[in-house]
Design a protein with these regions (language model features):
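Surface-exposed, interaction-prone regions used to assemble/regulate multi-protein complexes
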Residues: 1-164
Length: 164
């Protein structure tokens, strides 16, 4: 199938799917074609994702989940991205999503948006509200985290895990 989330064609990224997410067309076309494909991509990535993280990605509705912190580090030539997230519901609280051996990190839009307009969580000021998370596995794991206000984060990595 190739990489659905970040298809490389001649060196250019094709991100029509995430841009479509923020339009009125999404509600009309997503149930028929895109959501089933996104679910298939997540199922194919399941073998590479720890069970607790897979449960979070598969069953959670992200509109009440917030990114509190984004940290990018490099150690021994490997890049690591950590996102601290918080969900309003008590079952998740604060957790850290860790992306190991990151070979690609891209942000579309400002990482921090002063004009962000969403209901704030009770504990602190977040970087953004997570609208959805898409994961796919081809040669590497590819993750697209869609934030409010047409912003998104892309990562291509060897491993994803959930830290508490």
């Amino acid at each position: 199938m190739g990489v659905f989330l970040m298809q490389r064609k001649g060196g250019a990224d094709d991100r029509k799917t995430d841009r479509l997410y923020y339009t009125d067309e999404w509600a009309e076309i997503a149930p028929q074609g895109i959501y089933p494909l996104l679910c298939k991509c997540l199922q194919e990535a399941r073998s590479c994702i720890p069970p607790t993280l897979w449960e979070l990605l598969h069953k959670s509705w992200f509109h009440d989940t917030y990114v509190l912190e984004l940290i990018c580090t490099q150690s021994k030539g490997k890049h690591v991205v950590r996102l601290t997230i918080e969900k309003d519901a008590a079952e998740l609280s604060k957790v850290v999503l860790e992306f190991s051996d990151v070979s690609l990190f891209q942000a579309r839009g400002n990482i921090v948006d002063a004009k962000a307009c969403f209901p704030l969580p009770p504990n602190g000021t977040p970087i953004g509200q997570i609208m959805d998370i898409w994961v796919e596995k081809s040669a590497k794991l590819t993750c697209c985290i869609l934030l409010e206000n047409n912003r998104s984060l892309y990562m291509r990595c060897d491993q994803m895990k959930l830290l508490r």
